[in-house]
Amino acid sequence: ADNAGTIQTGDNGIGIYSKKLSSGPSTVNHSGTINVGNADATGIFLEDGGNLNFSSGAINVGNDSYGIVVVGNSPFNYTNTSAATVTLGNGSTYFYSNNPTTNITNEVSLNNPSGVGIYGISSPGTIVNNASFTLGDQSVGILNTGTGVATNKGTIVVGNSDTENKNYAIGMATTTGKVINDSTGSITVGSNGIGLFADGASSQAENNGTINIAGDSGM
């Protein structure tokens, strides 16, 4: 599937849907614009692996929706560059995967300092972030949901936590794997924010870079 034009999805809609072929993996090349609706809408949905090339173009995501979703267990490859752009509404996620083969090196920056409850990357595979994420209150930069390693080499800024409702602002988090803020990495959190969060018997958090606590009671 190749998209160099403009796609508009409604609420709970999907812009591009791709599924593994009987003859092998499918490939999506996106260099156009996808405007994603609200309420669990998705820009690009890849089922059972495949290849995604997002080296230019844009994905503009509404509220409580997703830019890219990857599900299944077959091998998945993601190529992206800093020329690609993603905008996110409240409660939305740039990249979500439940595919353990997902190995993502991210170059796409995110910038919504007033957005609430945004997730940058949520994936069980290996994650390397080289880009800048500036997100608002109750947001999470990188969530490692697997047993692998997520590494931040870029900049992650999140706002304040809502501790009363247990909605936290976190730079990087995991309950089963490892999160690393690399020597070139920088994480900044607001009031009651958490720079690195590892909660689980086998989880680990490692800081080799800079963590800035910009608000009261952060950690």
Residue ranges of model-derived segments:
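Beta-strand-rich solenoid/repeat architectures in extracellular/passenger domains
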Residues: 1-12, 24-41, 51-64, 76-91, ...
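Extracellular beta-strand-rich solenoid/capping regions of secreted or surface-exposed proteins
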Residues: 20-21, 123, 174
